[in-house]
């Protein structure tokens, strides 16, 4: 079903059964195949391919030669029914690839709202990107990677399968990330190592000085106290009882399975 207000270029190919919403623009040579839904006011510039069981939300801007919902590169994948879901108000630049999920994972590759994926970004099967993230040119996420809110991934960086990157993390360009990155941390290198707290990012997002002071103290507990993670966690949990900003740490460590960067 194509909404009457949608604008479809005559060279675009749209498979019967696709749902195209109000004021959607689909430019030259785009291909829409499968049970695709594209919601209101989303723009596909040109030469965009959307396949499979894919939902793209409202007010997204998707640039030329991007591929969304394509068969993933997991050799175990045998055509099972899996999904790709993209939220609202994302900017997805040229040559980005976003692959559908697998049944061995959560079955869904998901991107939230207000994210920027720059040129040549790859988002592999079962990745979960939350909101307000920036992935710079040529950043690569392997399968099952999770990015929490406000993560910045520098250009030419690569993140290993199953890694979790906590909220407000900044990864410098060219980083190779093979372990989980705690919230609020700046990291860079091959392999990525922590280099302090992302204070500039926190200031821009309205964190007050007392909260940033507590976050810095937790960073010191994790990386400069000489204590093991098991020794530090009860102290962090105690602080989190009275400071909601610190609850990010507690929730992160409950999910972490690969150990944290050191």
Swiss-Prot record:
Keywords per UniProt: Acyltransferase, Cytoplasm, Lipid A biosynthesis, Lipid biosynthesis, Lipid metabolism, Repeat, Transferase
One cellular-component annotation, GO: membrane
Pathway: Glycolipid biosynthesis; lipid IV(A) biosynthesis; lipid IV(A) from (3R)-3-hydroxytetradecanoyl-[acyl-carrier-protein] and UDP-N-acetyl-alpha-D-glucosamine: step 1/6
SUPFAM superfamilies, alphabetized: Trimeric LpxA-like enzymes
A biological process from GO: lipid A biosynthetic process
Its EC number(s): 2.3.1.129
Localization in the cell: Cytoplasm
First and last residue of the signal peptide: none
Superkingdom of origin: Bacteria
Xref: NCBIfam families: lipid_A_lpxA, PRK05289.1
Protein name: Acyl-[acyl-carrier-protein]--UDP-N-acetylglucosamine O-acyltransferase
